[in-house]
Design a protein with these regions (language model features):
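Membrane-embedded alpha-helical signal segments
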Residues: 1-182
Length: 183
């Protein structure tokens, strides 16, 4: 199995990740273009898996970094300028895709040949209990709730495939109810 290496060219990395992760196809795959120390950067994450407060603090911190503070490589960047404990590096775009699908946030920067993986995930969970009418002998006891993002995050937690797509649609002339088509 060949490894798809992270390139120093952010546009190439973005093209590959956008295709693999389904950016623009799946509503829950979030992409954010940011500038960190005058370098273009891209953040990828799954809605419902990332802690909003942590991501907000990270973005605020990244925006405040100056060009002079920017290290030459991703290893130094992760050590010096990523204010979060659970940080890893990855040079394989396919592994970055797998990590994003499991809830990790990926940061790629122009000129860096490694991605920075920030584990700020939180998994959706329900209180212990099983549906009263759908008793099963074995298997998952997960059940859906009223919040669609919570439900799609539950599905992503079980099916971590880059091939899974989720399209948000609306049904009903009056209610405009949100529905999600998964394929």
């Amino acid at each position: 199995m060949t490894m798809k290496k992270v390139s120093g060219d952010l546009a190439k990395n973005r093209d590959y990740l956008d295709r693999q992760l389904g950016v623009g196809e799946s509503f829950d795959v979030l992409y954010r273009n940011v500038e960190i120390g005058k370098k273009n950067a891209a953040l990828y994450m799954i809605d419902g898996f990332c802690k909003d407060e942590v991501m907000q603090k990270l973005l605020q911190h990244f925006i405040g970094i100056t060009k002079e503070q920017m290290p030459e490589d991703a290893a130094e960047m992760s050590r010096q300028l990523v204010p979060y404990g659970e940080v890893d590096l990855c040079g394989d775009l396919d592994e970055i895709c797998r990590q994003v699908m499991s809830g990790v946030t990926a940061l790629l920067l122009e000129g860096y040949e490694q991605g920075i993986l920030i584990d700020a995930r939180t998994y959706p969970a329900r209180s212990v209990g099983e549906p009263e009418k759908d008793k099963v002998l074995r298997g998952s006891k997960d059940g859906f709730v009223e919040t669609i993002v919570f439900n799609t995050a539950l599905i992503r937690r079980r099916i971590r495939s880059t091939q899974l797509r989720m399209e948000m649609l609306q049904a009903g002339k009056t209610s405009h109810t949100d529905i999600c088509l998964l394929y």
